Amino acid sequence: MVNECKILFESEIVLLKIYNIIDFIYIQYKMIEKKINPITPSQRQTLLLKRGTLTRVFKVKSLTKGFQRSNGRNNQGRITVRHRGGGHKRLYRIINFDRFNNNIEGFTKKILYDPNRSANIAYIEKSSKYYLILAPDGLKINQYIKSSPNADLKIGNALPLRNIPIGSLIHNISLYPQSKGKLIRSAGTSAQLIQKIDDKYAKIRLNSGELKLVLLTCYATLGVVSNVNHKTIKLGKAGRSRWLNRRPSVRGVAKNPVDHPHGGGEGKTSGGRPSVTPWGKITKGKPTRKKKKLLIQ
């Protein structure tokens, strides 16, 4: 009788795992590439993602606001970031990155598309309070989300690094105690907690392989950021890039000598020197930061 109960229990566990895998595959299928009939060259190159499981229209006024793009200009009106301008008009969704606030808890009502970032966002609601947070991969509707030192070790919950097991995948990591999450917020990214040092620091490995030390009292959210297939997108045409507020980038060799170090020459030229920026700095392969600076100051 005991053996039969064990067999039944194990079979139920196996079935539950199978159902979870099927559910995960179904959700991933809903978010895979969108097939476009290749009538034109641009459509033939295009590779987009389906958003069948996402809510596109969001009408909570207190969590949205209009904003004027800077288009790469500073407060003096001078261009500090090139190749920015145009783009479709958007409403900004006010995301709550300060998960150290223990009052942030509730049920996930919607998974939303956000045109202002690569990741999806989640609408959290409890009684009369509601928030928008970054949606981790695998977050489900009606799942309970909590930010607390005593929160369960579940995807979407936020805890201090002190209370997160070593080896866990995390995102939205704050750099200082009582501050908003700054690291690991793009689609499909995650960091790994690999060590706790002297009961004071946590060593984390970022997506790039870089190691950082942050205080154990800093908060992080469990899981990988949603929309993991974002990197497979192919825009297909220049117009779609313009919709995203990106302007064309002119090659240096196509310019005049006064405008770029690679410019000028009679006919087509290769530039005549290693690739550099318009200001003469090497662009390919030159390190631009210190690798061994572990501590975030």
Please name every model-derived segment.
Residues 9, 19, 24-29:
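Aromatic (phenylalanine/tyrosine) cluster motif
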Residues 116, 124-126:
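Structural recognition of beta-strand segments within beta-rich domains
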Residues 126-129, 207-209:
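Glycine-centered tight beta-turn/hairpin loop motif at sheet-sheet or coil-to-beta transitions
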Residues 130-138:
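Beta-strand/loop nucleic-acid-binding surfaces
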